[in-house]
C-alpha cells in the first residue's frame, strides 16, 4: 500500500484531510480470489492473483473544545468528554495505477466520554458506513476481528476473521468504567483499588443482493472464502458481545471475561473468552 495525505487544521476545531491511496491485496492459498462460471452444468474457475484499487479519500473532523498535550513526537487529546465527529468518503477510480473498480464508500464516526460523577464514566464509539457499488469481497466492510488474547479498542474479541461481510453497517462500542462503585464496598478488596469495567459491543450489518456472489456463477465478484455462505453476512439480528472485567490489578493489569451473545450456533466460533491488557495509566 502507498498513500499520500494532506491535513489542514483550523482554530475552530475543524480539520480536513485528503488522501491519495493505491492498495494491492494479494491472494494466498488460504484466502483465494476465485471467480466461477457455469455453462451446461459444467463449472469452471479462474483465480486472480491480486486486487488493486486506487482511491481518493476526503475526511472531515470536528472536535469542539478539544485540547491536546503535545511533545516533540506526538500529541494526545485530553478532553475525551467533548464529542468528536468524523465523516469520510472514498472514491475509487478504475484504470489508474492498475485499479480495477469504480466505487464509493462513506463512513461516519462519533466518539465521546460520558461522566456520571462518582459512578464512573462511559466511553462511547458509534460508527456507520456504506459501500455504494458492486465490489468483490476484499473491498466490502469487514468487521475488525481481534484474534489475539489482548483487549483491543474497536474490535470484536469473539468474532472470527472475515466471518461477516457487509456493504452497510452501524456499530457501537461502549466501555463503562465503574471507578470502584461495587468493589470499594468490600473492605478487603477496597485496599487493592481494583476497578470494575463493563463492555458492550455490537454491529448491525447488511449485504445487498448485488454483492452476494452466486457460488456457481460469480460474474465479476469472487466466491466467499467459506463454503457455508450463511456464515458470511448478518441477518436482522445484530452481532453482539459483552464483557465484564477488573482493571488496576497490580496497577497495570486488566482482565476481562467476554461472552458472545448472538450467532452462537455457527461452526467454529468461540462462545466466551478471557482477554487481558497491560498498561500504566496516569
Regions found by a protein language model. Give the residues of each.
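Exposed, low-structure sequence patches enriched in small/polar residues
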Residues: 1-282
Amino acid at each position: 500500500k502507498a498513500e499520500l495525505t494532506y491535513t489542514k487544521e483550523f482554530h475552530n476545531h475543524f480539520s480536513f484531510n485528503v488522501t491519495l491511496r493505491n492498495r494491492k491485496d494479494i491472494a494466498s492459498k488460504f484466502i483465494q480470489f476465485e471467480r466461477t462460471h457455469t455453462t451446461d452444468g459444467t463449472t469452471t474457475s479462474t483465480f486472480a492473483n491480486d486486487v488493486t484499487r486506487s482511491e481518493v479519500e476526503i475526511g472531515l473532523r470536528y472536535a469542539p473544545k478539544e485540547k491536546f498535550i503535545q511533545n516533540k513526537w506526538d500529541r494526545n487529546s485530553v478532553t475525551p468528554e467533548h464529542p468528536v465527529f468524523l465523516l469520510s468518503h472514498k472514491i475509487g477510480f478504475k484504470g489508474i495505477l492498475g485499479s480495477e473498480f469504480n466505487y464509493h464508500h462513506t463512513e461516519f464516526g462519533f466518539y465521546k466520554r460520558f461522566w456520571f460523577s462518582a459512578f464512573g464514566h462511559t466511553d462511547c464509539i458509534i460508527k456507520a458506513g456504506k459501500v455504494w457499488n458492486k465490489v468483490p469481497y476484499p473491498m466490502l466492510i469487514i468487521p475488525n476481528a481481534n484474534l489475539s488474547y489482548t483487549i483491543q479498542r474497536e474490535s470484536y474479541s469473539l468474532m472470527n476473521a472475515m466471518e461477516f461481510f457487509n456493504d452497510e453497517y452501524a456499530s457501537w462500542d461502549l466501555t463503562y468504567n465503574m471507578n470502584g462503585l461495587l468493589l470499594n464496598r468490600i473492605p478487603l478488596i477496597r485496599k487493592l483499588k481494583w476497578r470494575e469495567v463493563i463492555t458492550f459491543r455490537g454491529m448491525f450489518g447488511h449485504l445487498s443482493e448485488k454483492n452476494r456472489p452466486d457460488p456457481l456463477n460469480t460474474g465479476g465478484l469472487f466466491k466467499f472464502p467459506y463454503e457455508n455462505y450463511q456464515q458470511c453476512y448478518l441477518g436482522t439480528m445484530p452481532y453482539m458481545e459483552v464483557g465484564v472485567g477488573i482493571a488496576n490489578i497490580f496497577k497495570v493489569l486488566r482482565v476481562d471475561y467476554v461472552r458472545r451473545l448472538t450467532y452462537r450456533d455457527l461452526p467454529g466460533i468461540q462462545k466466551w473468552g478471557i482477554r487481558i491488557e497491560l498498561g500504566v495509566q496516569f
